[in-house]
Regions:
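Catalytic center-proximal scaffold of phosphoryl-transfer enzymes
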Residues: 1-228
């Protein structure tokens, strides 16, 4: 069984009523709302025997804008659906495909036996941040990092990054590399599972589903939105 989770950032016209958006000290308005998407499915299959397109098996979607205790209630709704529709004693494994956001990790702690797998999009995003300054050697450097994540230790991974950091032409890229390194290290086992491609680990479709389910109406081709 698979649970996938991601989010979209929606720009609001107002929060509760027109004119209530405020600016902070950096002159940015508080008009961003995080919309959460979680969906449960049983795997991936071809749309037809000869098709190159694939589809999720029995997907069920949940959307919300919850925070704090409401986030707990949001995840409870997800797990209530799972408990009501599946005999968990017969489910061999539940995989969580996600980017490791705090609201997602808090949800994972609410059910036993979840195996967290980092999605490909975010692995590649942060590998690019670590290697973008390598230019023509970028892909070779990324391959070396993938190999370290897949089958070596955190120490091996950090030694490669130290070497890559030494190739920076100036100090402007240091924070980029530091942040990307910290992200992968904080999701280390989840990244390993993704890159090892073991049985049961399926490709994540979160970015595509966020685009189709949320972004098409809320951010990339938006309508007008408020909280109320």
């Amino acid at each position: 069984l698979y649970i996938e989770a991601d989010e979209d950032h929606v720009s609001l016209q107002f929060r509760d009523k027109k004119g209530d958006l405020e600016e902070n000290e950096n002159h940015r308005k508080n008009n961003c709302l995080i919309t959460k998407l979680v969906y449960v499915h049983e795997g991936i299959e071809k749309e037809s025997p000869k098709s190159e397109r694939h589809r999720l098996i029995n997907p069920y979607y949940f959307c919300g804008t919850s925070y704090g205790e409401e986030n707990t209630a949001f995840w409870d709704e997800v797990y209530e659906y799972i408990n009501n529709h599946y005999d968990l004693d017969k489910v061999k494994k539940i995989y969580m495909n996600a980017d490791g956001g705090a609201w997602i990790k808090s949800g994972m702690r609410r059910i036993a036996g979840i195996t967290y797998v980092l999605d490909e999009f975010h692995i590649e995003k942060y590998l690019t941040k670590l290697t973008s300054h390598m230019k023509d050697s970028r892909e070779d450097a990324a391959d070396e990092l993938r190999a370290a994540i897949r089958s070596k230790t955190k120490k091996d991974f950090e030694e490669i990054i130290d070497r890559l950091e030494g190739c920076l032409e100036n100090e402007t890229g240091q924070k980029r590399i530091s942040d990307a390194k910290e992200y992968i290290l904080s999701n280390w086992m989840a990244a390993k599972l993704r890159l090892r491609h073991q049985d049961g680990v399926k490709g994540s479709s979160t970015e595509g589903h966020v685009s189709h389910v949320l972004s098409s109406r809320m951010s990339s081709r938006p309508m007008g939105w408020s909280i109320t």
